[in-house]
């Protein structure tokens, strides 16, 4: 099946796979029986972050299941949490196709999707149905602004989306770093970000995080850290996709959009280490270029409380979460670490 999907156009393959997973998600016993074989349930993997308990630190990054259609499948496949979105207050179709590209030689993807989604209200209905099933999957909700909303009114979009979705998320992420919505990254700059956080922080008592770009300078990252602390956010998600293209082999490397996967690995780790130096109690969620148990272990040791995957899962297939978590347990045993909680206390 995995090989068949790779023979299709990338966006068509994503749509087909997501449709099948959404169907499977609603099948009750057909979901729960395979979950017993796929999930790695081990108390050593449990994580506490921003007041939420996670069965393991490996999560599905935003972008895979924007509209919260296949949440049961992510639980059954072994993820410790899933982040839906990016969701905007109004539905939007996103950028013209083609807009998703596989760079197989680089184990990477380029996307310029443009926040295509069915809107916050529809996603809220899906999230409500999932919550009623009682499956123990912590959920993050990634929020963005509509393309046609001017920057000076961006906060209103985030607030509108949050009002629909606030009852159903365990934590919320403000996406101000996608390279595929014109002008959006300006919201990472001091004055815009200061105003945005000042308006969003009082809107929910639930954990609020900020997603940052890998292309920020150390000085800009420090400014983001300072504002995150000033407005009492609970953490940062680092990093989004990059505009950089160094060292790529694929003929598709010049396509416009955000690059994810293996080429992002080094920069994602650099940003994580920089943020960890000044985090001072903030939870850090690392994403970008995670492909192996060693990658996962490295992020946790560098200061991440949680780690997300997207492109690695696309290339690694449905057993990818299980392989990473079993490998993580072996690495913990080899280094004499009895629990991830112990690693955090150290």
Swiss-Prot record:
Its EC number is 1.3.5.2. It catalyses: (S)-dihydroorotate + a quinone = orotate + a quinol. It holds the Pfam family DHO_dh. GO terms for cellular component: cytoplasm; plasma membrane. It is found in: Cell membrane. GO terms for biological process: 'de novo' pyrimidine nucleobase biosynthetic process; 'de novo' UMP biosynthetic process. The active site is at residue 178. This is Dihydroorotate dehydrogenase (quinone). The gene is pyrD.
